[in-house]
Design a protein with these regions (language model features):
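Short gly/ser-rich loop at a beta-strand->alpha-helix junction or flexible surface loop bordering the NTP-binding
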Residues: 1-187
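Surface segments flanking catalytic/ligand-binding clefts of nucleic-acid enzymes
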Residues: 9-13, 20-26, 167-304
Length: 304
């Protein structure tokens, strides 16, 4: 991609459609709104509300898209940061415990506390035009800058996930590292080194659940390898230690496969391979993506 980054092709269609739907459906509110008279609405920013049932059915990450877009329209110059910027792009991330919308001003100055919009936090990070983009009028840091900000904020798991997403979208480890190394903003030397080195330590995994599992285990110093051949017959996307295969959203009996055309024999062979691997000492742990994302510490402790 060179030095001139093209961001339009990276916009996630689902996030874009949700953002545009919010702008069509939003209802303007004010301090004078009498909420008991509109019990079907929920406030998503100082000046905006949406249908309560619809919003609560979105799930936390999609709520981040709506809340970030709403808060951005209320804040005239502010730029979304961190997980709230990642949500607008459809990047891979895990939601933080603090759900306040994260912002920065282009100057890097912090606004007076009495001027802060509700449920927002500002970082003293400069956000020059070269580090930002607009998605349907919502000001966000671009994906490379979002990755560096995760490193600045010591959110290493989300930094790893951002790398995985960038690799999947055609960036190289060299491009990510070079951007971090030449980043002009203020950043602690150790975190700059981390941002420059980390792209070479993150494997290329095609899906968010496996990338999340690898990031959590690697961050916990668990010896985990990817794309491993098991004694010439089996295969593991993730192998912890020497014998523990991590499987996510997989059916151990391959029942769904049997319903497909010509799937009966293939399902039989998959089950036979499972038994072959078990007979040679390979253990398997099955998780769903929702289990890992909902209880990451529990996932790591079960593997350890």
């Amino acid at each position: 991609m060179g030095k001139t980054w093209e961001w339009d092709g990276l916009v996630d269609q689902a996030a874009q459609e949700l953002r545009q739907l919010y702008f069509r459906e939003r209802i303007q509110v004010s301090r004078k709104t009498v909420w008991r008279e509109v019990p079907h609405l929920i406030q998503v920013s100082r000046r905006s509300a949406v249908d309560k049932q619809w919003f609560r059915g979105l799930g936390l990450k999609r709520q981040f898209v709506v809340r970030g877009a709403a808060a951005s329209r209320d804040a005239r110059k502010a730029v979304l940061l961190g997980e709230f910027a990642a949500a607008q792009w459809g990047m891979w991330f895990v939601a933080p415990k603090d759900h306040d919308v994260q912002f920065a001003l282009p100057s890097g100055h912090l606004p007076p506390k009495n001027a802060l919009p509700v449920s927002t936090k500002f970082k003293a990070f400069k956000t020059p035009p070269a580090d930002t983009a607009e998605l349907d009028g919502v000001r966000v840091t671009h994906p490379l800058r979002t990755y560096v900000d995760f490193c600045r904020m010591q959110k290493v798991v989300n930094a790893r996930l951002a790398i995985g997403w960038l690799l999947r979208h055609g960036f190289t480890a060299d491009e990510i590292s070079d951007y971090a190394d030449s980043f002009a903003g203020s950043i602690h030397p150790r975190r700059r080194r981390l941002a420059a080195i980390l792209p070479y330590q993150v494997p290329h995994l095609e899906t968010f659940p496996y990338m999340l599992a690898h990031s959590l285990l690697d961050d916990s110093r668990v010896n985990v390898r990817t794309h491993c051949e098991l004694d010439r017959m089996g295969f593991a996307t993730l192998l912890a230690g020497n014998d523990l295969v991590i499987l996510i959203d997989e059916d151990p009996h391959w029942r769904a496969l049997e319903a497909e055309p010509d799937g009966l024999r293939l399902a039989h062979n998959r089950r036979k391979r499972e038994r072959w691997e078990a007979a040679r000492g390979f253990r398997k742990l099955y998780f769903t993506a929702a289990e890992i994302e909902g209880a990451p510490n529990s996932f790591v402790s079960e593997v350890i």
